[in-house]
Amino acid sequence: LKFGTAGLRGILGACINRMNMYTVRKATQGLANYILKQNGAEKGVAIAYDSRHFSPEFSDEAALCLAANGIKAYVFDSLRPTPELSFAVRQLGCISGINITASHNKPQYNGYKVYWEDGAQITPPHDTGIMAEVEAVSDWASVKTMEKQAAIDAGLYQVIGAEIDDAFIETIK
């Protein structure tokens, strides 16, 4: 499964050419490497997901990879629309956002879209920089992860929800 300009999108399944926890972890490790090179770890990453199969699980896999790299993950407590993720990235002052979604694709698909600190999908030079970092992750053993409770205890995994919802709704009124 190849990381493109909008991220990943593919059929769910076991293999390196499918969407699964391993491809999500690899993409996130590449994103984490890029964020670390940008000195953006302290800003954190907001993560949202949709109602597709395994979206909540992929959201957690991404968050735990970020946390293992010392990057705080702000994870929505349930599914949220893409515009709210964009808002959350800006509201929380994050360097990036991840949306676990395959958008308009068929139900057997899922995806992984990356947003930058302006709340928009990644554009040059960040898109090519992140793609290069993802492609550079060739050793699966180099992909970091950690236990969820350890990430919470370390302050690197924070659940978000109503406070962002309220601010988002107030902003778009």
Residue ranges and their predicted role:
Residues 23, 27, 81, 126:
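Catalytic-loop motifs flanking and including active-site residues across diverse enzymes
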